[in-house]
Amino acid sequence: MKVLLAGNTGYVTEEFVEEAFPECQVMVLGNKMIKTVRRRELISRPFPRTELELGDIFRTYEFEAVVYFSNYLTLHGELEGEAENLRKILQYCRKGVQSHFLYVTGPEGMYDVPTGKTLLVQNAEDVCRRYAGLYGLKVKILRVPYLYSGTYKKDFFYRIFQASKESQKLFFQEAPEQKA
């Protein structure tokens, strides 16, 4: 089976790929820490800069499954670009032979308190559902706890530990209305 891993792939390791996708041809987009290993059928490359490049990848590999790791898996992660990248991947999934799409996201989608972040997460999940309804994609949404890593540079705790290591001080900002 040909599998594409895209989105917030900084948490994906070679060991994870071997365990989760044995005997599959796997392409990981956007993770600089994973190296291509042809004998294991693992291909790693940067996320395409243009839609034409992304289209070429989908036409060349004809993925049977796509796993999209949301930026919302990272505590206090980067939110910009999530909807656009998700839309691009879904567009090519609907055009190709792809049969399964798994959207792995953080826990915010189940919260009832409307905040900017919960609204964005719920909208991303709705986009997945709409593509499933409109184009017959087989979409699953998996909500998981936040992911943490001591090596992924965009990770919340990695940044805290690096700051601590460099300045020997930790600073946690509180909301102004919070009382001591």
PLM regions: where:
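N-terminal Rossmann NAD(P)H-binding glycine-rich loop of SDR-like oxidoreductase domains
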Residues: 2-23
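Structural signature of the Rossmann-like NAD(P)-dependent dehydrogenase/reductase core
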Residues: 5, 68, 100-103, 140-146, ...
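A generic structural motif
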Residues: 21-27, 137
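N-terminal Rossmann-fold cofactor-binding loop
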Residues: 29-33
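NAD(P)H-binding glycine-rich loop region in Rossmannoid oxidoreductase-like domains
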Residues: 47-88, 111-112
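Active-site segment of SDR-like NAD(P)-dependent oxidoreductases
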Residues: 73, 106-111, 145-148
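Conserved Rossmann-fold NAD(P)-dependent oxidoreductase catalytic core, especially the SDR/UDP-sugar
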Residues: 84-120, 140
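NAD(P)-dependent short-chain dehydrogenase/reductase
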Residues: 118, 122, 126-179
